[in-house]
Structure formats: C-alpha cells, structure tokens
Amino acid sequence: MNPSNNPKKTRHQSHMPQERDETKKEKKLLHRNIERQRRQEMAILFASLRSQLPLKYIKGKRAMSDHVNGAVSFIKDTQTRIKDLSARRDELKREIGDPTSLTGSGSGSGSSRSEPASVMVQPCVSGFEVVVSSLASGLEAWPLSRVLEVLHGQGLEVISSLTARVNERLMYTIQVEVNSFDCFDLAWLQQKLIEQLVLSTTRH
C-alpha cells in the first residue's frame, strides 16, 4: 500500500500547518502584550521622573530623551550644590569645635558660649537640610522644639532631626522634605529662619 494514500497520515499532516500558525499567533500575541505592559511601565516611570524635576529642566521639552537629559543636568547641579554647601557646613563645624580658635585657657568656655547662634540651609537628596548651632543653655539658647516650631510655621515637613553637643553648644541637623526646589529660595529661607528664631528668643 502506498504511504501517501494513508488517510490517517494525510489528515495528521494537514493539521500541522494550522497548529504552527496558531503557535505563531500565540507568540505574537504574548510578545505584543509584554511590549504593551513594558510601554505602560515606562510611561509611569517617566511621569514620576517629570514630577520630581524642577520646571526649568523640562520646560518646553516633550521628548523622553530630553527629560532624561534634564534629569542628568538636575542631578549634576544638585551634586554641585550639595558639595559646595557641605564644605561650608564642615567649615562651620570646624570653627565651632576647634579649640585653637578659643582665646585663653580660662576664658575658652566663655568665648565659645558667647558666639552667636547660626542657621545654615542646604539641599540634600530628599529636600534640604537645616543645620542650627545654638548655645546649650541660657536666655539665648534655641531649644530644638523652638526650631521645629519655626519650621512648621513656614509650612515645612520635618522628616528627621539629630542633636549633637559640641563645646557647650547644641547643633541640630534637621531634614526637611520638599517636592521641588523651585518652591524655595534657600537663601531667603535661611534668613527667614534666623529672623524668626531671634524674634522668638526676644519674646521669651
């Protein structure tokens, strides 16, 4: 008997192209769904990225590549600001904690205590950092509660605070969360905090 005349084999062979077509269709559909999901996830990620960037870095730019470049520029600028302001903070800490800056062994403590209080505001990853140096006691001392009260009065959200004692002075390092640096002039905020703290001290 001629194998080509076998009806069972002929029927089986006739189904094979159809099965291959179905498999190809399923693979294409799966690939299409995966690609659609990937695009949706990318769109969500880019929307999140845009929401974190100050307007000046993405204004007038629609392409995703422009937004990525804007994010790179923002990160570089922020790193530069953090580096510069961290150097200023370290210099301030050295001035406060350096015993050679004090005059005379008997008057050293008094000299350190007589230094005026100071406030420094600098950007950090989640927003900005407020570093406050104050006398540890006395009428001119700035308790942490008073500093936090002034920050809350400016509508700022404090996420953490750290207190350290250096040469009979208190140093507060406070982290404040913000959504965008465009909403804040850090130099203005620093001066405003100083004014409010000094004013609150004169009232007490």
UniProtKB/Swiss-Prot annotation:
Q: What is this protein called?
A: Transcription factor bHLH120
List keywords of the entry alphabetically: DNA-binding, Nucleus, Transcription, Transcription regulation
Query: What GO cellular-component annotations does this UniProt entry give?
Result: nucleus
Q: What gene is this protein translated from? A: BHLH120
Record-linked InterPro entries: bHLH_dom, HLH_DNA-bd_sf, MASH1/Ascl1a-like
Pfam entry (one): HLH
Could you tell me one molecular function GO term of this UniProt entry? DNA binding
Q: Which organism is it from?
A: Arabidopsis thaliana (Mouse-ear cress)
**PANTHER family associated with the record:** ACHAETE-SCUTE COMPLEX PROTEIN T5-RELATED, ACHAETE-SCUTE TRANSCRIPTION FACTOR-RELATED
Domain (bHLH) ranges:
26-78
Q: Which GO terms describe its biological process?
A: regulation of DNA-templated transcription; regulation of transcription by RNA polymerase II
Q: Where located?
A: Nucleus
